[in-house]
Amino acid sequence: MKRSLTALTVTAVVAAAALTLTGCSGSTPTEDAAGATAGTDPVALTMWGTYGNGGNTAQTDVLNDTLIPSFEASHPGITVEYVDIPYDSLKQKLTTGAAAGELPDLARVDIGWVPQFASLGVLASLDETMDDFTTLADATYPGSLATNAWDGHYYGLPLDTNTRVLVTSQAALDAAGMSASPATFDELETMAANLEGTGIALFADSGLQGWNVLPWIWSGGGEITDEGLTTSSGYLDSAASVAAVQMLVDLYQADAIPNLITGNSGATSTSDGLPSTQYATILDGPWMRDIWTGQYPDFTPIYAPVPAGDGGSVSVVGGEDIVIPASSSNQDAAAEFVRFTQSDEFQLAMAQVGQMPVVESAGSAAAQADPFYEPFATQLATAKPRLAIPQSSEVDTILSTELTPAFDGSTTVQVALTRAAEQIDALLASS
């Protein structure tokens, strides 16, 4: 599967240019990289990323002022220039750069992009080029690692991660007569019954894409495909998957879930509805702490695992991966920086500015240093990735398009998931 960019067929280059903006321990140096550290062959690496997205300078400051200087000090002869690019522009820049043969040595990319670029031969397969890849990979959260897999190889390593957990408030728990967050599907339904007549909706979410519905399907014991990513039929439309989605549909039709989930842009957002106690629960991530601290300083959210069904408590993985373009002429030096990103030094420094570690031991250490991260680190132990295929954004469209009529009552959940599975089968076949 590994190909250099110069070996790409004309078709693949055209396909790369056609990609759209779809798509959220240190180690012993290699012999070649060690030569660079000795100063015999200076190497200047360039890395593209989005650490400054939204005007956030805290992460770029740590990277440029602390981490890169530390790496350069321990690797004489290798320098790293980080180029910050707006998130909305990075994928297009990578796409046009691939077509023109003008890519950096390293890139921090959204987890959903790795299969797309790997399928076009744009990325180096790290499991083939890094002798210690297995050791590094085994130290990360399995769900985060899986986002780098494509066609039997791994084209990156996790860089930072996140997941969604259940968030509620003491006011909502009091209104429902509960002493703790609902830990199971049954307790969630009990909470819904207890909230009847209070004017508080049980749960809210902003869509029906994979990010939204997969935690419920997985926790209910369902799957979206088989393990080998060859078929969706029989999995997405299984009895377990149907039952999990049916629970949401029943709650929606009982007015326990507002129509924000089916696309009503005029509905109160989850970030406003939870602190104002319009909504009793939502699923959300660690980034909400800073948002609520600024907008609702008196609000104290309560974080807990996704309610468990027959499949346990399972959420969805988000985050970014680090990749090496196959066109880079500095593969060994770039691999040295990839190794550095997996170290406790890098992971814990970034944790202090809001990036959740991908290395399990660093995740535990970050949770001990800041208990806020504990529920997210716990959830990541079982969290799963969305489908790691080039057409992942199309899967989201299929789910949303087919599930909306089921929520509105114009079709059944079984029919909706069967239709979705058939369309995903076609995507898997074309992959």
Q: Where in the sequence are the language-model features?
A:
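Conserved N-terminal structural module of periplasmic/extracytoplasmic solute-binding proteins
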Residues: 3-10, 17, 21-115, 308-310, ...
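Extracytoplasmic/periplasmic substrate-binding proteins
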Residues: 72, 215, 246-330
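A structural signal for short loop-to-beta-strand junctions that line the ligand-binding cleft
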Residues: 104-105, 134-171, 201-202, 312-314, ...
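Short, solvent-exposed loop/beta-turn-alpha elements that line the ligand-binding surface or hinge
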Residues: 127-140, 202-203, 222-243, 294-296, ...
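Conserved C-terminal helix/tail region of periplasmic/extracytoplasmic solute-binding proteins
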Residues: 174-175, 381-431
